[in-house]
Regions:
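Active-site machinery of serine-nucleophile hydrolases
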Residues: 143-145, 149-223
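Primarily recognizes the serine-hydrolase "nucleophile elbow" in alpha/beta-hydrolase
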Residues: 223-224, 230-276
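Short beta-strand/loop motif that positions the catalytic acidic residue
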Residues: 280-283
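Bacterial N-terminal signal peptides
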Residues: 2-17
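A domain-start/cap signature at the N-terminus of enzymes
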Residues: 23-144, 426-440, 444, 455-462
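C-terminal beta-sandwich/jelly-roll accessory domains of carbohydrate-active enzymes
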Residues: 344-466
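C-terminal catalytic histidine-bearing segment of alpha/beta-hydrolase fold enzymes
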Residues: 27-34, 38-41, 288, 292-384, ...
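Short alpha-helix in the alpha/beta-hydrolase fold that links the catalytic acid
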Residues: 160-163, 288-298, 397-401
């Protein structure tokens, strides 16, 4: 698949930084001087940009020859500098601090101007949506973004996008001066259920429409604008909060924070996948009990931070804006999390950060206690990865040197069975492909491989031994 097509598809498949965006205290300092990092960053950006132009099917004849020359020159310039720096400083693929700077501009964006909230017309297959882009926006600088999902009005209909924007944030809010705000247009027939009832014939089609209206449109924004992947937020109104929690469970590495303006019970959902996400629950007299109950559940999920914010005005609580912004300032996604839990709520959604389940039992048919779940913990000090899996036959691990030392063999412990993994070679081209596929310049993993979960040994009475 061409790089240009992969960039486009990544925004729909997953909806789609700076040097410190995903570093952890264990990561060594950069090897390169800032000027050398910046030089490689610019050359990689040109390399990717010219490859996309070369892959363009519309480039034929002299246009293709011109694109070929530009691509060859950019590729040679990047690899020449990469080799020079690698010869001097060692393998750059092991230096996370350097990679994050070098890849920060690897996904190209058109130069677009700021705009107050404006409706973007539907363009098949992307539905219509509203978009606000701050005056401070620059295509070369990652910008915080909010997916603002409207709530229901008194007639149980979804509030129109501009009306909802004005009721919650508006152009005058400080947030609008430094944040991209995306408001989907939700059709009257769409129900943002906590969990669809797939026994109904229309459920699959309704789920497809939800994804188109909310997620496909947000992917369009991420393709067109330089959205900071470490600072994406989901802000949901009444009637959409259950769906917001489900969406966060499906895509745990998509949002750094989730704001629920009318929290509700989500008893149908397993919440184990939410580690790493910050939650802000807006509490009123009507929702105080629901806030307390949801917080009690979220507090039991390792890696989740949940805050209740008492409100002082009427729903949807525009007066809470300054406190919400203060909370948002402290939220930032960390990609290289050392512990990952995946507890799927649907069979299709089974990936988080650097772990994805390949083969598993069906969530919908497995008995309680045997539903698929995997817990993966990387210990770089011991150069060990521990995996505890239930209902899972195999999984894929994407690794970098923040998680384990790839210069040496490392130990895998899967359901208490340990073995030594041989040294894995870092691969630049596959790292680049995975980053583009994910549409995320912080997703930097030069190694990927499959782990098969050992089948449990049968007990003596099950094998007939001793009879």
């Amino acid at each position: 698949m061409s790089l240009s097509l992969t960039v486009t598809l990544a925004c729909f498949a997953h909806f789609c930084p700076v040097a410190d965006a995903a570093m952890t205290p264990q990561d060594p300092a950069p090897k390169l001087a800032p000027a050398d990092q910046k030089a490689l960053q610019g050359k990689l950006a040109k390399f990717v940009e010219t490859q996309i132009a070369y892959d363009d099917p519309a480039a034929v004849g002299k246009a293709r020859e011109k694109a070929q020359k530009a691509y060859d020159a950019a590729r040679e310039a990047f690899w020449s500098d990469w080799k020079k720096q690698s010869d001097k400083h060692g393998d750059l693929l092991k230096s996370i601090a350097d990679l994050e700077v070098i890849f920060a501009s690897a996904i190209p964006y058109e130069r677009k101007q700021a705009m107050t909230l404006r409706k973007i017309d539907a363009k098949d297959p992307v539905p219509a949506y509203y978009l606000s882009v701050p005056k401070s926006y620059k295509s070369e600088t990652p910008t915080r973004a909010v997916l603002l999902v409207p709530g229901l009005d008194d007639k149980q209909e979804w509030v129109e996008g501009k009306k909802w924007f004005d009721a919650t944030w508006s152009d005058k809010a400080p947030l609008a001066s430094d944040t991209i705000i995306h408001v989907p247009v939700v059709s009257k027939a769409v129900e943002l259920d906590t969990m669809p009832d797939y026994s109904k014939t229309e459920s699959e089609e309704q789920e497809k429409q939800r994804i188109q209206e909310l997620l496909l449109s947000f992917g369009d924004t991420q393709r067109g604008y330089n959205v900071d992947r470490a600072r994406r937020f989901l802000d949901a109104g009444k009637g959409a909060c259950g769906f917001a929690v489900r969406f966060a469970c499906h895509f745990p590495d998509l949002f750094s924070g989730v704001i629920l303006r009318s929290p509700m019970a989500v008893d149908e959902l397993r919440l184990g996948s939410l580690g790493g996400i910050n939650f802000l629950l807006l509490s009123s007299a009507d929702t105080a009990a629901a806030c307390d109950a949801l917080k009690a559940r979220l507090d039991k999920v390792e890696g989740v931070t949940c805050t209740i914010l008492p409100t002082t005005d009427a729903y949807p609580f525009a007066a809470a804006g300054p406190e919400i912004e203060k909370w948002m300032a402290g939220c930032k996604r960390i990609v290289n999390r050392k512990k990952i839990v995946i507890e799927p709520n649907e069979d299709r959604f089974k990936q988080a950060y650097w772990v994805s389940i390949a083969d598993m039992s069906s969530v919908h048919t497995a008995p309680e206690g045997s539903k698929p779940r995997v817990e993966v913990e990387a210990d770089r000090a011991q150069n060990r990865i521990k995996i505890t899996a239930v209902g899972v036959e195999s999984l894929m691990l994407s690794l970098n040197d923040s998680l384990v030392d790839l210069d040496n063999k490392f130990t895998l412990v899967v359901n208490d069975k340990a073995w030594e993994e041989g040294k894995r070679n870092r691969d630049f081209n596959n790292l680049l492909k995975r980053m583009v596929r994910k549409n995320d310049t912080q997703f930097l993993f030069p190694v990927e491989f499959r782990v098969n979960v050992p089948k449990p040994e049968k007990k003596a009475d099950e094998t007939g031994a001793g009879k």
